[in-house]
C-alpha cells in the first residue's frame, strides 16, 4: 500500500519505515461525513443523528483554522458521495473548500499527499504500491 489512515494518532503525516514505506495520513471520526450525515430508519441510534450542514461547516472550519494555525498539519476529510453529495451539503463543502483555499490550503487527494510526503523525505513509492 501507498498510505494508511488507520492509527488516528496525530495531525501530521509520517512514514512507516521498512522495505515498503507506507505513509500514515491522519484522520479522525470528526472529519468523516458519515459521523454527521448518516441516517437510517432501520437503526434506532441514527434516527436523530443527522446534523445540519451549517453545524458541520463550523466544526470543520474551526478545526481547519486551528490546524492551519499550528502549521505542518493535515486535515483529511473522509467524504461519501451519497452523504455529502446532497444539495445543501455539497454547497457547504464547496464553501468550506473555497474558505480553505483562500486561507492557503493545498487541496489534494490522499494518493497525491502520500506521494508528496515520500518525495519530501527522499523516498519513492514502490512501483506496485496501491493507493489505499
Task: Spell out what each predicted region is.
Residues 57, 61-132:
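C-terminal domain-boundary segment and adjacent tail
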Residues 1-71, 121, 126, 131:
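Active-site-adjacent pocket scaffolds in enzyme catalytic domains
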